[in-house]
Amino acid sequence: MAGHSQFKNIMHRKGKQDAQRSKAFSKLAREITVAAKLGTPDPAMNPRLRAAVIAARAENMPKDNIERAIKKAIGGDSENYDEIRYEGYGPGGVAVIVEALTDNRNRAASDIRSFFTKSGGNLGETGSVSFMFDRTGVIEYDADKASADDMLEAAIEAGADDVASSESGHEVYASQDTFRDVAKALEAKFGEARKAALIWKPQNTVAVDDETGEKLFKLMDHLNDHDDVQNVYANFEVSDALMAKMAG
């Protein structure tokens, strides 16, 4: 099992360790506050904030929590978070990118380096693996929002690079430069997306055996469970059997 669907499933496994809703909401609130602080507190005028709010809604985060996170930025009483990207190699030489928002750079770096080392991998310098990924925008819609043909036609017309449709929904990919315009065009036609964000999409994936795959999933679990970590991306694929086992 390769391609779009497994990449999506691997990236979205974070939902398993984020089952503790308070931890999930805390991470979402942190992104909302940072986005509002860096730009305008109006989601309609701030693409990053809008994406953060959409992500929060998709996780059923209460409206009050969302508004409180925005108000923290407006009030100026929020913590100062640094955006940091960590890059390294996990088990099997798999490339891993970690995006974090932290109020303590030393703590975050120490913890994340420890996770890599204990997994048999190593944390590298910025730029050590990101050249193997594309900074890409992804816009996701539920399957019932449009047929595969209608979504493909609309996406191409809007300037998207690629579309993947399945029973679980539609994933539209666009370059970093055209992403916002594509998202806006699709929203005008199909309504609000369930997700619209910039991601690190691997240019190619590496097939790993089940033993290595389990080690990689364990590393990703540790990373995703860290309070400072917002997103984790990796360029591997595993067998259908292991994917089903780890998702269950």
Curated annotation (Swiss-Prot):
- Coiled-coil segments on the chain, per record: none
**One GO cellular component from the entry?**
cytosol
Q: Which Pfam families does its entry note? A: TACO1_YebC_N, Transcrip_reg
Q: Where is this region: Disordered?
A: 1-22
Give the subcellular location: Cytoplasm
A GO BP entry is: regulation of DNA-templated transcription
Q: Which GO terms describe its molecular function?
A: DNA binding
Q: Does the keyword Transport apply?
A: no
The yes or no answer to whether the keyword DNA damage is present is no
InterPro entries linked: Integrase-like_N, TACO1_YebC-like_2nd/3rd_dom, TACO1_YebC_N, Transcrip_reg_TACO1-like, Transcrip_reg_TACO1-like_dom3, YebC-like
Q: Which UniProt keywords apply?
A: Cytoplasm, DNA-binding, Transcription, Transcription regulation
Main localization (coarse): cytoplasm
Signal peptide residues are: none
Family that this chain belongs to: Belongs to the TACO1 family.
Do you know which PANTHER family this protein is assigned to?
A: TRANSCRIPTIONAL REGULATORY PROTEIN YEBC-RELATED, TRANSLATIONAL ACTIVATOR OF CYTOCHROME C OXIDASE 1
Record's protein name: Probable transcriptional regulatory protein RPB_4273
Q: What is the lineage of its organism?
A: Bacteria, Pseudomonadati, Pseudomonadota, Alphaproteobacteria, Hyphomicrobiales
